[in-house]
Curated annotation (Swiss-Prot):
The lineage of its organism: Bacteria, Pseudomonadati, Pseudomonadota, Alphaproteobacteria, Hyphomonadales. This is Chaperone protein DnaJ. Coiled coil: none annotated. CXXCXGXG motif repeats lie at residues 151-158, 168-175, 190-197, 204-211. SUPFAM superfamilies: Chaperone J-domain, DnaJ/Hsp40 cysteine-rich domain, HSP40/DnaJ peptide-binding domain. It comes from Hyphomonas neptunium (strain ATCC 15444).
Amino acid sequence: MSKRDYYEVLGVERGVDEKALKSAYRKLAMKYHPDQNAGDTAAEDKFKEVGEAYAILSDPQKRAAYDRYGHGAFENGGMGGGSPFGGQGGNPEDIFQDLFSQVFGAGGFAGGRRRSGPQRGADLRYDLEITLEEAFYGKDETIHVPQAVACRPCEGTGAAPGTKPETCETCGGHGRVRAQQGFFTMERTCHICQGRGQIIRKPCKTCGGHGQVKEERKLQVKIPAGVESGMRIRLSGEGEPGTSGGPKGDLYIFVEVVEHDIFERDGPNLYCRAPVPMTTAALGGEIDIPTIDGGRARVAIPEGAQTGRKLRLRSKGMPSVRANGQTGDLYVEMFVETPQNLTARQKDLLRQFCDCSGADCHPESEGFLGKIKRFWGGEGDEKRPV
């Protein structure tokens, strides 16, 4: 079967530069890497194909020969005896590892060679809900976190007490094995030890051979005053234990402040809506506004106050967790409450007020009526819509 054009394999033009060539190869190699497509022979063939194409086109001498003679440059012993890797001992996996180690460091890709030595433990997440009042004052919270700890009976080895894990004979303790396929050498996770490099003949009954068990730990967490939803608190070294003597991971506590019945929050500022009796709004007066600290603030209402008017109470908001010593404000939006369930006398008094009130008492209404008249083209009924 004839081979595809190497440029076509990598999806690049013939004049592609080295940077774009490397980028195209990296994308395809990640897509078709055997460790990402276990058991998929088609993906494995693709991985070999892109590796072969990159081996030629990334070498200036071989690329020049390919551009001039095509695949014939590497047949009948030319340019390395028929192997596109030119007798240098290279293979698609080695090219892939060399390229990705430049980007991620040794072992940085999931399909890379097994990392040896101490490994840091995994980080943990804990979601914590608190009230707005708790966020205002801050608090010391006790949390219970389930996490993996080293199994005490086997001391974290996973082997039954009195026994030890044995080095895997198949991979020699490396966790990965190599298989020769023509001129390719493929590296895979060892199927005997599952990449651990060790075999446990007699597993520990307590942990089932895992070397770790789940326990619930009680921790004290200090929640700072002014904390907001979405903020996280880091407890260093309170995550999962490391392996082979590696350090513990960290515990991240994600805070969620639940909605409040009265106040809405925007950073350090608080907002609320306060009902104002119609008479107070008309004559002026005072109303009491609840504050987040559990107290009350007396607010002066000016004569003729209207719905939607906002009042600002300085330093009655939330403490700022980002700026020590600073406190936000409380913004109060008024809405005039229309009286309901009136008695006959109350209705009569309102009618008397209506009879003696003029345009000066309702400037907004008069202004609105004037706009309507101008919209209709005057006061005449002949131009009004039916």
